[in-house]
Design a protein with these regions (language model features):
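Conserved small/polar residues in nucleotide/adenosyl-binding loops
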Residues: 1-5
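Generic detection of short hydrophobic beta-strand segments and adjacent strand-loop junctions
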Residues: 163-165
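Solvent-exposed loop and edge beta-strand segments that line ligand/cofactor-binding
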Residues: 7-22, 31, 66-76
Length: 165
């Protein structure tokens, strides 16, 4: 997604949007490595378009002006897109390389995830402590070539059977 498209979404939205739109916006922002924008979209979705029980009701339940719609049909796709948006913030592998914490908001200093799946039959776990990546664990279920963008600022150690770099 190019910057022009991202700016267009921000400029023309959200009058005709529903809650689902914010979940998908979070995915788009995460894919563009905009963690702050992704978190903002998810926050709006949760605060304005979810009922107290966590169900997604397409219209703006808070009447905050985040949508021109206020109706209450229950749908699941907004919640599923929300979960996808969080995962895209934590881990991405769609471009042929694995990126750990590619779209983390600036105020998320301590974050971890366990056993998220990446393309290529890889299972990834990672930790961020005080804003620095402290652990990345990748398990290959089928073998094959691992391409990982180095998330570490300094020295690191690779442990495992094959260590070709």
């Amino acid at each position: 997604m190019c910057i022009r498209d991202r700016n267009t979404l921000d400029k023309y939205g959200p009058g005709g949007w529903t809650g689902y739109s914010y979940s998908w916006l979070a995915n788009l922002k995460a894919r563009a490595f905009d963690g702050n924008g992704a978190a903002k979209a998810l926050r709006i979705f949760a605060e304005c378009f979810c009922l107290r029980n966590g169900f997604h009701a397409n219209g703006d339940q808070s009447r905050s002006g985040k949508s021109g719609f206020t109706y209450r049909p229950f749908t699941l796709e907004g919640n599923m897109a929300f979960a996808s948006g969080v995962q895209e913030m934590l881990l991405q592998s769609h471009s042929g390389v694995i990126r750990v914490f590619p779209a983390i908001p600036s105020d998320w200093k301590d974050v971890s995830f366990d056993k998220l799946r990446a393309i290529g039959a890889f299972v990834v776990s990672a930790s961020l402590e005080n804003g620095d990546v402290s652990l990345v664990k990748v398990v290959s279920e089928k073998g094959g070539l691992l391409r990982l963008v180095n998330p570490f600022k300094g020295k690191f150690r690779i442990a495992g059977k094959k260590k070709k770099i």
